[in-house]
């Protein structure tokens, strides 16, 4: 889970399933909760992992600051899809049995950081 809070200006965009970007601007006192890959695996896809970006359209005259807060489960946490979520999504797990540490290591390798 990522909490996106305290942005000083517009620019938050969310990737939609058709590949287009949707403006996700908020008021200063609002928080955006961004679900990630681990929560998607744990819920067998009930909660979808989201992709976001931040663009600064008026880079010449303003700066945009934000304070993201990332939360990860402990390394030994079991990310096996929850049985109730598997039941609600057709009865078959869509994600492998793995720990949070194993998932994070694989992801970091995929993006060239491990």
Q: Which residues are covered by each model-predicted region?
A:
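C-terminal flanking tails of non-heme Fe-dependent oxygenases
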Residues: 1-114
